[in-house]
Amino acid sequence: VPWPGCCSVKAEIHILRNIDVYFLTLASLCLVLSVSLGLGMGFAQDFSLSHLHSHLNLVGWVSMALFGLTYRAYPALAEGRLAKAHFLLSAPSGIMFPAGIYLLITYGQPIPAVAAAIVWLAGATLFCVMLVRLAFAKGLA
């Protein structure tokens, strides 16, 4: 055990309670990166990374922020292992997908982008399933 309590149930519950904050923090970092990239492209008048810029905005900033806000609006969504699985699928792939697009644009390597996109799709699908389950549980569907 690297540090006391790292793998305890209490630590896992703590992560799930703050999943909204983790998604919102990650989203804000993506926003800053995307705006910086956009400014750099504008200053240089080189828009060859525009696909990276748009994916960093939509996958990183918008989607992650919407995940975070949804978890904040519906705290019951963060209960259970599906929320943790969703975070573990979406957070890394939300960063790796735009990074893979960078590798595709600059080096012609499509595999990282494709792999990250598939993991991102799995996370998005899981989130959709979680929302539908919550809607049925609350009698909204």
What does each of the following model-derived ranges do?
Residues 2-141:
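Hydrophobic alpha-helical transmembrane segments of multi-pass integral membrane proteins
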